[in-house]
Amino acid sequence: WGEEREIAVLFADLRGFTSLSEEQLPYDTVFVLNRYFAAMGAAIEEAGGHVDKFIGDGVMAIFGLQGDFELAKQQSLVSAVNMARALDRLNESLADDLPQPLRMGIGIHAGAAVVGEMGYGSTLGMTAVGDVVNTASRLEASTKEFGAQLVVSEAVLGNTKAEDPCSERHEISIRGRRGMLAVRAYAAATDVIRQTATG
C-alpha cells in the first residue's frame, strides 16, 4: 500500500567517523557502529519514531505513521534530545576505546510525503519518499556549515520566538526546492527542549 501523509523526518550522521575508523581495526569499527546504532534506535523508538534505515554511519527515522502530525513534530524533537543524551552516555562508556568522542549532526523537517511498503525481497519495508525526506537530509548536512548538532526547520518548531537565545535562525536554499527555507540551528540538540518549552 502507499499514501500521502504528513510526517516528520529525522536524519542523523556521525561526524568524522570515516577518518576515525581508518585508525581502528575493522572489528572495532563494527563494534562501535553497532553500539551507536543500538543507542540511536532505542532513542528514536522511545520517542515514538520508526527507524527507517541505517545508511553507512547515519540513520533515518520517520515520525507520524499513526497520523497525528503535531505529535509527530514533537516526537521528532524529543528524539533528537534523546539521541544527543544517548551519544553522551555512549561516549562515556567508550572513552577508553576511542581516540576522541563521537560527534553527530541531526536534521529534521516535516511535511507531506508518500509513505508505504517499498523495496524488494528482504529489503521490503515501511519508508517515505518526497521533498520532506530530501530536505531533512540536507538539514543534517547543514549542521557542518553552522557548527551545530541540530538543524530543524521552522515547519517543525511552529511558533518560534524570534528572540530565542538557544538557536541561530538561518534561511537556506534547498536544491530542487523553490524559495528559501527558514531553519533554526542549535549548538546542542538538548537546547531545543528549552525553546519548545517556552515557545
Regions found by a protein language model. Give the residues of each.
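A structural signal for short, well-ordered beta-strand segments
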Residues: V9, V59, M104-A110, V183
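Cytosolic regulatory/linker segments at or just downstream of nucleotide-handling modules
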Residues: A113, S142-G199
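Catalytic NTP-binding/metal-coordinating core of nucleotidyl cyclase/transferase enzymes
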Residues: W1-V78, M126
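Catalytic strand-loop-helix junctions within cyclic-nucleotide turnover domains
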Residues: I62-A72, I106-M126, T143-F146
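Nucleotide phosphate-binding site architecture
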Residues: T18, M60-A61, V114-V115, L157-G158
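Short flexible coil/turn linkers enriched for glycine and charged/polar residues
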Residues: E3, Q100, A112, Y120, ...
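Residues that recognize and position ribonucleotide moieties
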Residues: I7-L10, D52-K53, I106, Q149-L150, ...
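Alpha-helical scaffold within the catalytic cores of cyclic-nucleotide enzymes
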Residues: L33-G49, L65-I106, D131-S142, P165
